[in-house]
């Protein structure tokens, strides 16, 4: 009888732990969100004027509204993560966890056009080589927010 009670108690504890942990299992981490929204290592540069229209849609950045501005970085994830140990600068919001790349990086800026209207979001594609500024958090310290390019 005691063994049966112990087994039932163990199962109850396991179920309660699963219920508590389960909601976070499907949640995208800030680092994964940064990668989805800003990383495009497979492309060395914007390949066409339609690049932003395609990428913004495929990365779910036009799901509920037209995101006004977004930047894609065409460098390796390791190179972008390395920025978190480079030049410390103030973020636009005043936080102190932003870092500027020592070297320029290949980026594509996507800006919503005046004729854009949800759900038919339209973007202007601009290719550039600039220093990037990212906010970093966590352990390991990784990019979680694209702050600017200069």
UniProtKB/Swiss-Prot annotation:
Catalytic reaction equation(s): an [RNA] containing cytidine + H2O = an [RNA]-3'-cytidine-3'-phosphate + a 5'-hydroxy-ribonucleotide-3'-[RNA]; an [RNA] containing uridine + H2O = an [RNA]-3'-uridine-3'-phosphate + a 5'-hydroxy-ribonucleotide-3'-[RNA]
Disulfide bonds, paired cysteine numbers: 52-110, 66-121, 84-136, 91-98
Consequence of substituting residue 38 to A: Loss of activity
Glycosylated residues in this chain: 27, 33, 60, 63, 67
Signal peptide segment: 1-26
Annotated Gene3D superfamilies: Ribonuclease A-like domain
PROSITE patterns per record: RNASE_PANCREATIC (PS00127)
InterPro entries xrefs: RNaseA, RNaseA-like_dom_sf, RNaseA_AS, RNaseA_domain
Tissues/organs with expression: Pancreas.
Record GO cellular component, one term: extracellular region
One Pfam family, short name: RnaseA
Localization: Secreted
EC number: 4.6.1.18
Active site, per annotation: 38 (proton acceptor), 145 (proton donor)
Protein family membership: Belongs to the pancreatic ribonuclease family.
Assembly notes: Interacts with and forms tight 1:1 complexes with RNH1. Dimerization of two such complexes may occur. Interaction with RNH1 inhibits this protein. Monomer.
Official protein name in the record: Ribonuclease pancreatic
Protein's organism: Bos taurus (Bovine)
Taxonomic lineage of the native organism: Eukaryota, Metazoa, Chordata, Craniata, Vertebrata
């Amino acid at each position: 009888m005691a063994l049966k009670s112990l087994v039932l108690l163990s199962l109850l504890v396991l179920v309660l732990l699963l219920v508590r942990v389960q909601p976070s299992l499907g949640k995208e981490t800030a680092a994964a969100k940064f990668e989805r929204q800003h990383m495009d290592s497979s492309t060395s540069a914007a390949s066409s004027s339609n690049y932003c229209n395609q990428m913004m849609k495929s990365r779910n950045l036009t799901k509920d509204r037209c995101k006004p501005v977004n930047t894609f970085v065409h460098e390796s994830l390791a190179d972008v993560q390395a920025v978190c140990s480079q030049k410390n600068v103030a973020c636009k919001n005043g936080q102190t966890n932003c870092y500027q790349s020592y070297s320029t990086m290949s980026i594509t800026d996507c800006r919503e056009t005046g004729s854009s209207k949800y759900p038919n979001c339209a973007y202007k594609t601009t290719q550039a080589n600039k220093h990037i500024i990212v906010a970093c958090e966590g352990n390991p310290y990784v990019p979680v927010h694209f702050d600017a390019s200069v």
